[in-house]
């Protein structure tokens, strides 16, 4: 009996020690450390709300965000308060040098362009937030890679996005655009020359078809299931974000995590079939498009394995294919839809762009070599990227004490670079910063920005978006072909509601009135 009492006493003591240790860790993580960092940040000159246990600013964050997205706004390009509502509220309340409590972790608003440049120039010191298992599942690949994996993958994938290689994909991009033009012409012809459509689903499918053809020699129909899986993963990930600031909260979302893994495995299986089918085709000696992204990626990793032994494994190749499908289509669709909205609103610029297309290309098929001569369309795309940057904000983290300019940033801090605030800042861009004026880019980006690193729609530095040139080529071709065939006008039913759902999208669609130019000639 005495032995059992002794064992029970020891077990009780061990349990008490474990509970005390766990309670101390919780206290350190959820109270002592945040309060210590809060004091340090205020000493650095940053202002924000006092830390509130566990939730920080998040209850207020969700309330403000919910209110902002509950209704559309009057048409204006001054969209910061709707796209980043709580950050806008905090900057207005506390100034540019401010912070938000994302649970127990502070997020500093970095508004100084030179500090943004320094952060993005040092990806090892100011790194992406990891581990981030949700992001790894939804996107993965190069976009979330870090450590030795990132430079190894970047070196190989760079070959696929070489400008000369990209030219080989343009015929596929052209076919995708031609299919969409044909669909729109059929709709217009059925309604005596003009009709109203919601352009957003068409543009989403066009972007998906372009990346399917250019990357895999496939098309949207064949890749439809992959895009459906990506959408379902994104919806689940968005739900995770609501409690992601609470430590260990994800461990209790057992059902959601299981579903996420099932979706991810099905996507991997779908992509594996595409990759293996391509490999078998090559082995049989059948002709394939050697310039599509998958062919270049497989060839580059094969050579790297032979020469350096550091190529990508088949699992890593499939992971990068997932990025092609998801990020590749999403960013292109966002840029193209906001370009259509802006041109439908600012018909003077639409006319100027169309005149340029007819002057450079004529009314026949697109000449790929002449895409670079479309200066006005390039100016328009830059202005759309400035006003409606796909990402809206960039996020980096510190895991140790870091020097940033004259500041010493403590560890366990996130750094938020609200791109949309930079892009709409009148101190940087002038009094018309919130107006649509592509003319500001008439002498190029450097002249428009006065040499400052303030135009970063595709990020900046070593981790700049590797597919940005491809996205610009895709959108430039699509815009040119649309303007060759149609005039565009915003419908009275259009509701202006930019929304940051991972990337910026039109919450209620993009209703435009299409008129077939051939019907008016």
Regions picked out by a protein language model, each given a short descriptive name:
Residues 417-446:
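Conserved cytochrome P450 K-helix/beta-meander segment immediately N-terminal to the heme-binding cysteine loop
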Residues 2, 9, 35, 120, ...:
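Cytochrome P450 heme-thiolate monooxygenase catalytic core
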Residues 332-343, 478:
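Short, small-residue alpha-helix embedded
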Residues 221, 347-350, 415, 468-505:
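Cytochrome P450 heme-binding "Cys pocket" and the immediately downstream C-terminal segment
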Residues 62, 72-95, 269, 273, ...:
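Conserved cytochrome P450 K-helix E-x-x-R motif and the immediately C-terminal K′/meander segment
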Residues 159, 322, 327, 393, ...:
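Cytochrome P450 heme-thiolate "Cys pocket" and heme-binding signature region
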Residues 1-4, 82, 487, 503-521:
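C-terminal helix/juxtamembrane-tail motif
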Residues 2-138, 146-148, 152, 174-182, ...:
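N-terminal membrane-proximal hinge/A-helix region immediately C-terminal to the signal-anchor transmembrane segment
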